[in-house]
Amino acid sequence: MAKGQSLQDPFLNALRRERVPVSIYLVNGIKLQGQVESFDQFVILLKNTVSQMVYKHAISTVVPARPFNVTGHQNAQGGYGAQDDAPSGE
């Protein structure tokens, strides 16, 4: 895992896992809203009424709508997604 990913991945994964609504501001000023459905090294899949694939290089800021706990859990493929949704201990 690259050093720059050490905070980003657990942050995005906690948002995804807890289904926290987010506002994502792009570098061009556009505001997107929804829930993080999945993500990898380059993109975030944002779900609202439709799913949008947002390239990370176009993102300026990610703002959670409510407080949440950040803990890291990475799957064997090196990404985060539906396969690690089960609560810990199950």
UniProtKB/Swiss-Prot annotation:
UniProt GO cellular component terms: cytosol
The organism's place on the tree of life at top rank: Bacteria
Keyword terms of this UniProt record: RNA-binding, Stress response
GO MF entries: RNA binding
Entry keyword RNA-binding: yes
Signal peptide: none
Example GO biological process: regulation of DNA-templated transcription
Domain Sm: 9-68
Task of the protein: RNA chaperone that binds small regulatory RNA (sRNAs) and mRNAs to facilitate mRNA translational regulation in response to envelope stress, environmental stress and changes in metabolite concentrations. Also binds with high specificity to tRNAs.
Subunit structure: Homohexamer.
Family to which the UniProt record says this protein belongs: Belongs to the Hfq family.
UniProt-recorded name of the protein: RNA-binding protein Hfq
Organism of provenance: Shewanella baltica (strain OS155 / ATCC BAA-1091)
Gene that encodes it: hfq
